[in-house]
Swiss-Prot record:
Record-given protein name: Protein SprT-like
GO cellular component, one term: cytoplasm
Positions of the SprT-like domain: 5-141
Active site location: 65
One Pfam family from the record: Zn_ribbon_SprT
Keyword Nucleotide-binding among record annotations: no
UniProt source species: Streptococcus sanguinis (strain SK36)
Length: 145
């Protein structure tokens, strides 16, 4: 999919205004669906949103970013809290918030061999060096959660 052409198409169909800048995929975006850059007018989009939720949700995110874009160039309130932004977003059926992507960080679960306590950690624990904080028993790697 040529992203810039798709954004131009959505802009004309849903807003009736032309998109004159570039749109890019940005793999570094984690918690947001897209970003508008007023300095040079380009838009960034999160490819994981498109891959995870499909074209219908992605189109609503494109509408959200285009609402920022068009309001900025019309000299109106383009920020999330501005009335102009909220009204335009409602008119074009854009998403107010990006759907959350699942947190890809998993936990390691350690089990105390003495008291059975479960301890969750993101990083590995040196089992030769560390013990249970409750009973000082030995730990063993139980599972990845």
């Amino acid at each position: 999919m040529n992203l810039t052409n798709y954004v131009k198409q959505v802009s004309v169909e849903d807003f009736g205004w032309e998109f004159r800048h570039q749109a890019y995929w940005n793999k570094r975006l984690r918690t947001t669906g897209g970003r508008f850059f007023p300095k040079d007018g380009h838009l960034d989009f999160n490819p994981k949103i498109y891959e995870t939720f499909g074209l219908e949700i992605f189109r609503k995110i494109v509408r959200h970013e285009l609402a920022h874009y068009h309001l900025y160039y019309q000299g109106k309130g383009y920020r999330h809290g501005d009335r102009d932004f909220k009204e335009l977003l409602k008119q074009v059926d854009g998403l107010r918030y990006a759907p959350s992507l699942s947190n890809s960080q998993s936990f390691l679960v350690y089990e105390c061999l003495s008291c059975g306590a479960l301890i969750r950690r993101r990083r590995r624990v040196n089992l030769q060096k560390y013990r249970c904080g409750r009973c000082m028993g030995k730990l063993r790697l139980s599972e990845k959660a």
